[in-house]
Amino acid sequence: MGEIIHRSKTRPVRVGPLTIGGSNEVIIQSMTTTKTHDVEATVAQIHRLEEAGCQIVRVACPDERAAEAIPEIKKRINIPLVADIHFDYKLALKAIEGGVDKIRINPGNIGRREKVEAVVKAAKERGVPIRIGVNAGSLEKRILEKYGYPTADGMVESALYHIRILEELDFHDIIVSLKASDVRLAIEAYEKAARTFDYPLHVGITEAGTLFSGTIKSAVGLGAILSKGIGNTIRVSLSADPVEEVKVAREILKTFGLASNAATLISCPTCGRIEIDLIRIANEIEDYIAKIQAPIKVAVLGCAVNGPGEAREADIGIAGARGEGLLFRHGKIVRKVPEEQMVEELKKEIDKLAEEYFAKQKENKAALKGSAAQ
């Protein structure tokens, strides 16, 4: 588990309007918990996921009713839609026909070659990529007999088996995942996969657990994987509201500087010098910036003596003192504000910074468009 692996040469694969792999940013994915045939509930949950920053969403497609709901769901959402298929190739065909942007299916599990050929033909015609999803808990019997128990080598071998089936049919729009609930096994499997083939990798720790324990497990496992330059899409799997999965994924990516569209909070751990209700303020500001899709660093600090210096890298922040706070930008004090106005004043400044960022982005796009037209 040694050197850093740079994935800049990963094969690019289109998923709807997004390009996965290549030198593109890591994309956040989640999965709905609703019954897919319940279109209203599924669309409502996807809208909440979109608002939280989800960029690709997967839905279970276990039966005909779910597959038939795909066109209506697709029509009413704004992010790429993935259908999760197990065994039944007819459901894959129906989902592709219904407009999904990607399917998750293991070609070796859907029966005779002509069934696989039918799915690949439909996927090719529609430009729909296929994700091969290897899971340590459901490896093929022959692999378990060979290795005795789930191993990283066995997981990569399973992935290669499914990859070769698709490659033999001249299909290369492939994304691969190798998930395990054992963090060390997942890390090793992804490392080996990154050395073995150049298809984009969807990374995740499966069955991670509840919001608290699963967040920690995912942060440790995915952090280790991402730190090696591995991973093109990410999903945090939690026994919780899927919106929480997206929030955790965004925080993990922000930690590595891999989220270009997310605001970050810096806050101190508190101590005996604190004269303000810093924990409440920090939580309120964290909630406020959660949906801001701009790379702004915000600091909430409890000490007016050390605060500005400690948060020099922050774009905007407050440092509290008794009855008042110092509002600062880029480590320089802008003005003093009364304690009761601190939060609202900080929110106003955050909004200004976000507006400045979006205006700059708009200018840059216009300039690029202009130079391309010349």
From Swiss-Prot:
InterPro entries: Dihydropteroate_synth-like_sf (IPR011005), IspG_bac (IPR016425), IspG_bac-typ (IPR004588), NO2/SO3_Rdtase_4Fe4S_sf (IPR045854). Binds 1 [4Fe-4S] cluster. It holds the Pfam family GcpE. Its EC number is 1.17.7.3. Coiled coil: none annotated. Keywords: 4Fe-4S, Iron, Iron-sulfur, Isoprene biosynthesis, Metal-binding, Oxidoreductase. [4Fe-4S] cluster binds at residues 268, 271, 303, 310. Pathway: Isoprenoid biosynthesis; isopentenyl diphosphate biosynthesis via DXP pathway; isopentenyl diphosphate from 1-deoxy-D-xylulose 5-phosphate: step 5/6. Its cofactor is [4Fe-4S] cluster. It catalyses: (2E)-4-hydroxy-3-methylbut-2-enyl diphosphate + oxidized [flavodoxin] + H2O + 2 H(+) = 2-C-methyl-D-erythritol 2,4-cyclic diphosphate + reduced [flavodoxin]. One of its GO terms (biological process) is terpenoid biosynthetic process. GO terms for molecular function: 4 iron, 4 sulfur cluster binding; 4-hydroxy-3-methylbut-2-en-1-yl diphosphate synthase activity (ferredoxin); 4-hydroxy-3-methylbut-2-enyl-diphosphate synthase activity (flavodoxin); iron ion binding. It is an enzyme of class 1 (oxidoreductase). Converts 2C-methyl-D-erythritol 2,4-cyclodiphosphate (ME-2,4cPP) into 1-hydroxy-2-methyl-2-(E)-butenyl 4-diphosphate. Belongs to the IspG family. This is 4-hydroxy-3-methylbut-2-en-1-yl diphosphate synthase (flavodoxin). It comes from Geobacillus kaustophilus (strain HTA426).
